[in-house]
Amino acid sequence: MSWIVLLIAGLLEVVWAIGLKYTHGFTRLTPSIITIAAMIVSIAMLSWAMRTLPVGTAYAVWTGIGAVGAAITGILLLGESASPARLLSLGLIVAGIIGLKLSTH
């Protein structure tokens, strides 16, 4: 169950990371509310997952999901670069996340 909660927390990290772009420095109300809510829930879920998962593993997976998710969202929806080096780097992060999952008891 902790891994599922951590996955959802990571996906919410993507929401708030992308949301930051649309808050315009927290001057736009609706994007700001969505972004802050996603931040709070994401961190609360990360904290809950850390009750049973090692801190280093949980935090690395959470940030990895957020980083990869934000980068992929940027590529697919915001027209950001999808260079081979960038895609390879994202693949390495995913491999690291999988490795952490497989090596955690």
Curated annotation (Swiss-Prot):
TM region positions: 2-19, 29-48, 55-77, 87-104
Topological domain ranges for the Cytoplasmic compartment: 1, 49-54, 105
GO MF annotations, alphabetized: transmembrane transporter activity
Topological domain ranges for the Periplasmic compartment: 20-28, 78-86
A GO BP annotation: monoatomic ion transport
Gene Ontology cellular-component annotations: plasma membrane
Subcellular location per the Swiss-Prot or TrEMBL entry: Cell inner membrane
InterPro entries named in the record: Small_drug/metabolite_transptr (IPR000390), Small_multidrug_res (IPR045324)
Keywords of this entry: Cell inner membrane, Cell membrane, Ion transport, Membrane, Plasmid, Transmembrane, Transmembrane helix, Transport
Main localization of the protein described in the UniProt heading: membrane
Membrane topology: Multi-pass membrane protein
Functional description taken from the UniProt entry: Guanidinium ion exporter. Couples guanidinium export to the proton motive force, exchanging one guanidinium ion for two protons.
Protein family according to the UniProt entry: Belongs to the drug/metabolite transporter (DMT) superfamily. Small multidrug resistance (SMR) (TC 2.A.7.1) family. Gdx/SugE subfamily.
Protein name: Guanidinium exporter
Organism, scientific name: Klebsiella oxytoca
Classification lineage: Bacteria, Pseudomonadati, Pseudomonadota, Gammaproteobacteria, Enterobacterales
